[in-house]
């Protein structure tokens, strides 16, 4: 049998890296389920009047979950067999004296041993060592999420559920205290919800894998001054890349490309403190883009900027939307900003009260005023024109509004 045939036979039987990751994901999900069941059980037995049937049901679920975990742990022997398979293949290849093939075969042996180590680490760490993959095209899925800042406080987030698909531009709006920014803090792991489930591209997010889940996310905060670390724009963009352990040889191209996307390539050698508010925020966006997150969260990213700065950031967000390569979640109380979104999620006192297209929200002026939100400028102009008997068709921005008025 020649070397090619030996490799083909080995490849048809070996455990691949994808097989390992799928196994660890399954293990991870069972550990999450077991942890949830344990918490349910503890909460139940603390109650004065214990529901015995519910208690028994949880005990059965815990037992079954442990059985599934043990089944997966038992596959350790398969990873050991995989090493033997690789070593057997290596011996056959070694006899050929083909140095390139011998190196290739040795790499397969090393990979097989590495996979066993990774699997054992996953068992010891309850699955937290897994590198998360996209399991579906739902960028963010939130189910029955609730959070309060302390037992004496009401829910800041109260049984909220929604989904955001990959490539969508979604805004979350609400008055101060509605829970908008609390959701962003929960998404990035700064806060832990007391109830509910968050999935990022199908992966359940929990304490064990939050660091991995964060790699899907990039966030731009309200105050650009709080986001700078480097002494120059270039150094600031490089900081995140260094933490990510990006190859230093690749960094200059990544930095330049990210700066160009926000029109700040001219400022790479400048100090961030000497830039305007809008320019600083553009650098903050460039720093986030350099890390190439799948989901970009803008948390009140325009609220501290002057009108020119606001316009610049909104234009960048629209450009990102047009590529459909990033999922954009914009948390804002700027009602003019929602007009650029694919859909709008409305919160009021921690509750989700509406999910709709921007124009549907803008047209419902009574709804906006009832939940203490401003009517966008285009909506106010249309309202005043209608009072004077001038009817204008629904418009999504000021340019469309001017065009409609000119036709009258």
Swiss-Prot record:
Record-annotated ABC transporter domain positions: 140-374
Chief location: membrane
Alphabetized UniProt keyword annotations: ATP-binding, Cell membrane, Membrane, Nucleotide-binding, Translocase, Transport
One example GO MF annotation: ATP hydrolysis activity
Compartments where located: Cell membrane
Enzyme class: translocase
Keyword Lipoprotein found: no
SUPFAM superfamilies per record: P-loop containing nucleoside triphosphate hydrolases
Entry EC no(s): 7.-.-.-
SMART domains: AAA
Membrane topology designation: Peripheral membrane protein
One Pfam short name: ABC_tran
Domain of life assignment: Bacteria
GO CC term (a single one): ATP-binding cassette (ABC) transporter complex
Residues bound to ATP: 174-181
NCBIfam families to which the protein is assigned, alphabetical: ECF_ATPase_1, PRK13648.1
Protein's job: ATP-binding (A) component of a common energy-coupling factor (ECF) ABC-transporter complex. Unlike classic ABC transporters this ECF transporter provides the energy necessary to transport a number of different substrates.
Protein family according to the UniProt entry: Belongs to the ABC transporter superfamily. Energy-coupling factor EcfA family.
Assembly mode: Forms a stable energy-coupling factor (ECF) transporter complex composed of 2 membrane-embedded substrate-binding proteins (S component), 2 ATP-binding proteins (A component) and 2 transmembrane proteins (T component).
PANTHER family: ENERGY-COUPLING FACTOR TRANSPORTER ATP-BINDING PROTEIN ECFA1, HEAVY METAL TRANSPORTER
Protein name in UniProt: Energy-coupling factor transporter ATP-binding protein EcfA1
Organism the protein comes from: Mycoplasma capricolum subsp. capricolum (strain California kid / ATCC 27343 / NCTC 10154)
